[in-house]
Amino acid sequence: MNNNFIDNNVKLKPAEKSTALFLASKGFRIEVIIPSNTPHNKNPDFLINGKIWELKCPTKNRRETLERCFKKAAKQSENLLLDLRNIKGANKNTLDIIVSRFRYSKSIKQLMVIQNNKLLRYK
């Protein structure tokens, strides 16, 4: 297994594991945050280089879906990681919607987007 990836014995969904391994291969240190046992309490997904990040892996290329990713992530972390590799037809328009939403967000301070196996970072 990759030395940059610590799973803490947490069973990840395939998309989550794929994202973690992708980032680890890019040199990021990824640690899975152990989920809370408290009902209705959501934890962020990862520590990435020591910072808390929430991962969203949308599967639909719709503005509403992308908006929901921001709203849900903001409740868990100020850092959002969006992996678009599972969206069929993700294109420049998809990225434009995401970047525009990020620019107007008061709660999300950092954004990383994985699209076409490229990592894009915004602050």
Predicted features and spans:
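Metal-dependent nuclease catalytic core centered on acidic motifs
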Residues: 1-29, 58-123
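A short acidic/basic microdomain associated with nuclease active sites
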Residues: 26-39, 44-45
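Conserved catalytic cores of phosphodiester-cleaving nucleases, focusing on short active-site segments
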Residues: 46-59
